[in-house]
Amino acid sequence: MMPKGLFLALANAADGANHDDFNQWYDDVHAKEVLSLPGVKACTRYKLAGTQMLEGDGAGQQYLAVYEVEVDDWADFQTEMMNAFGEGRLTVNPDVLQMDPVPTTMMFEEVTPRVEA
């Protein structure tokens, strides 16, 4: 069985962009492109809640995409993703996606299996 993990992408809508347009592009175009990559199994998107644990908490980005991934090698996944950008299989739309600063991305390896209440 392949190791499981998460690929996280934190992003903002571009300055002056309509958030509905941003979300439509992200859901209908970008997330589907990422889901087409080998090993990407699912995606759930979130918006930063208005209340945080501590005043001022937040990563600076309003939106989070959580991709569930099963890969043997994270370096291969990163290479595949960069190749997909270079080949146009993964796209960005600077009209709706803030590119300065660029979205924050992180890859996490599973430490323990899912535990439920």
Predicted regions, residues:
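Macromolecular interaction modules
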Residues: M1-A117
